[in-house]
């Protein structure tokens, strides 16, 4: 990982010990790793700086485990300045307990006449229903399961599933499931059995290699499938852009004659414009080395930080929009090319052009409008998926599904 090396280089006088709760090949479960960490934190023996992705951050904030970073972050200026709206998305009662080092944006790719309908979650359902009306029998999304549909829509919806105090907002979960069912029903209506079987096989192949299915993998929701979209394997492509080359790839499709009328747009879901927060850093409130930990944090969110996705640091982000001068000639000369073939022998070739100033401005506008952070909450999401699947498949009423989600979360919160 790049995380420990950069602080060590910036502060050679400080010894940075880097501890991983769960290695790729060890047998430690997520629950066991969290229990061990929680015990250390409560005893005041935990790490000074923590990467909090996938951890029970609501509980940590409630228990006063994390240091308030607001004064420190608000004091950053010049090349240290962060995107203010992304910082504000983490402010609670004036306090900030964690900050993402990097982020992605949720996007949708498709024909203008359909994606122009998408303004919020019901707009997504309307667009897919309109596509089905115009394309009977076609595979609209290349997603053939209720879990796949729910996972695809989660990032732009989940931030509205909880109230400020961490309690469940049942109405928005109900609205989510209702519209996820509309999307699922429209996608599956008239779809060939061969498409459904092919999707099932892909999931099983992933399970045999990785112990999780394709739709359970991080790659399922990350990035875009431009090749699949060009090849006609789907009519709408939901995904993310999280780095400059990925955005250049997405915008290059707008230049193709065979995709006239197609574009990529920022995706709105439930309540607000969402950005996907990643590599969430927080500092232990009981750390005896809080000052050093803040210096280490400054490196992680600094201009020079080697993050894989868009940096929350404004200067670092702007630098990432600059193409490699050894490769770049002009906006109108391909920056690179990709050729891909599928199992049917169909070859797709794509010229990728570096983004022009207008396209960069569009991206900056998307970022400036983002006001809600998506931070994964696997316990809540798994509850929604499990009970929501029964509703989407017609095995349970919407009211019963939401009621069971509430019960499951109440038990978890009480533990």
Regions found by a protein language model. Give the residues of each.
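Short, polar/charged alpha-helical segment
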Residues: 2-15, 384
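Extracytoplasmic "Venus flytrap"/periplasmic binding protein-like
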Residues: 19-82, 228-236
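Hinge/lid segment of periplasmic solute-binding proteins
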Residues: 54-107, 258-267
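Short, solvent-exposed loop/beta-turn-alpha elements that line the ligand-binding surface or hinge
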Residues: 71-81, 158-178, 182-183, 265-271, ...
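Helix-loop-helix "hinge/cap" segment bordering the ligand-binding cleft or interdomain interface
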Residues: 91-203, 285-291
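Periplasmic-binding protein-like
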Residues: 133-136, 298-334
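Extracytoplasmic/periplasmic substrate-binding proteins
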Residues: 183-291, 295
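C-terminal capping/gating helix-and-loop segments adjacent to ligand/active sites or protein-protein/ligand interfaces
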Residues: 275, 335-413
């Amino acid at each position: 990982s790049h995380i420990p090396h950069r602080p060590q280089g910036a502060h050679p006088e400080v010894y940075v010990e880097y501890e991983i709760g769960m290695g790729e090949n060890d047998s430690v479960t997520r629950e066991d790793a969290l229990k061990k960490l929680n015990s250390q934190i409560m005893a005041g023996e935990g790490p000074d700086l923590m990467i909090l992705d996938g951890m029970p951050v609501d509980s940590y904030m409630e228990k006063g485990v994390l240091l308030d970073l607001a004064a420190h972050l608000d004091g950053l200026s010049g090349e240290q300045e962060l995107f203010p709206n992304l910082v504000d998305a983490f402010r609670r009662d004036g306090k900030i307990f964690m900050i993402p080092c990097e982020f992605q944006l949720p996007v949708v790719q498709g024909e203008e006449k359909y994606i122009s309908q998408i303004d919020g979650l019901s707009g997504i359902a309307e667009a897919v229903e309109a596509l089905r009306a115009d394309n009977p029998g076609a595979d609209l999304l290349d997603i053939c399961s209720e879990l796949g549909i729910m996972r695809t829509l989660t990032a732009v919806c989940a931030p509205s599933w909880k109230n400020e105090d961490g309690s469940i907002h049942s109405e928005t979960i109900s609205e989510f499931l209702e519209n996820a069912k509309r999307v699922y029903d429209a996608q599956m209506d008239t779809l060939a059995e061969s498409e459904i079987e092919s999707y099932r096989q892909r999931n099983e192949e992933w399970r045999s290699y990785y112990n999780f299915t394709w739709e359970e993998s991080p790659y399922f929701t990350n990035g875009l499938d431009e090749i699949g979209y060009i090849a006609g394997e789907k009519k709408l492509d939901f995904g993310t852009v999280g780095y400059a080359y990925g955005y250049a790839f997405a915008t290059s499709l707008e230049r193709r004659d065979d995709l006239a009328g197609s574009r990529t747009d920022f995706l709105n879901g439930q309540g607000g414009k969402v950005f996907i927060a990643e590599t969430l850093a927080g500092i232990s409130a009981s750390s005896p080395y809080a000052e050093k930990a803040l210096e280490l944090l400054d490196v992680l969110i600094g201009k020079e930080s080697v993050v894989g996705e868009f940096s929350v640091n404004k200067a670092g982000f702007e630098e990432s929009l600059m193409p490699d001068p050894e490769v770049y000639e002009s906006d109108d000369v391909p920056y690179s090319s990709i050729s891909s073939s599928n199992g049917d022998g169909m070859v797709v070739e794509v010229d990728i052009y570096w983004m022009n100033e207008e396209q960069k401005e569009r991206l900056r506008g998307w970022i400036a409008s983002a006001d809600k952070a998506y931070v994964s909450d696997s316990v809540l999401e798994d509850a929604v998926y499990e009970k929501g699947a029964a509703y989407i498949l017609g095995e349970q009423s919407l009211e019963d599904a939401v009621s069971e989600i509430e019960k499951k979360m109440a038990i978890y919160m009480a533990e």
